[in-house]
Regions:
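Carbohydrate-interacting/catalytic domains
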Residues: 1-137
Length: 137
């Protein structure tokens, strides 16, 4: 099966997702503690987009997930964040190697003091159709 490009692309995605899991304590340290998870937006039902944060102990290294479950890309999707620290894009399902469009995106996003999703800070991100973006802060 891996000789077919779509299967290879899915394997690439899972390989990198597993790598992200292994190197980020936010994905396993507080699995059984409510402090390890925070909804950012679970109510965007009309656009079928949700976002959440996985926290590490002491909230030193956190991961923000933004997931789009529709075939509609959102060019300047504003996502709320609980920090003004810069957010680094560490995994993007829209990369060519995962079967995405391969459209280039910035690596660093700097939140501004603009309330969104019940958070004091936010930034705009070009969220791809059926896309998942993971940011580290």
């Amino acid at each position: 099966l891996l000789s077919e490009e779509p299967h290879q692309q899915i394997q690439n995605w899972y390989r990198d997702l597993l790598h992200l899991y292994k190197k980020n304590p936010a994905l396993y340290e507080l699995d059984n503690d409510p402090a390890g998870f925070e909804w950012i937006n679970k109510d965007d039902i009309f656009r079928s987009i949700f976002s959440f944060v996985r926290h590490s102990k002491g909230k030193k290294k956190n991961l923000l997930f933004v997931c789009n479950f529709t075939p509609v890309a959102r060019e300047d999707y504003r996502v709320g964040v609980p920090t003004k620290r810069q957010c680094k894009l560490v995994l993007n399902s829209d990369e060519k190697e995962y079967g995405g469009s391969g459209e280039k995106r910035k690596e660093i996003y700097k939140p501004v003091k603009k309330e969104c999703d019940g958070q004091k800070y936010s930034f705009a991100y070009p969220l791809p159709a059926y896309g998942v973006a993971v940011f580290e802060y």
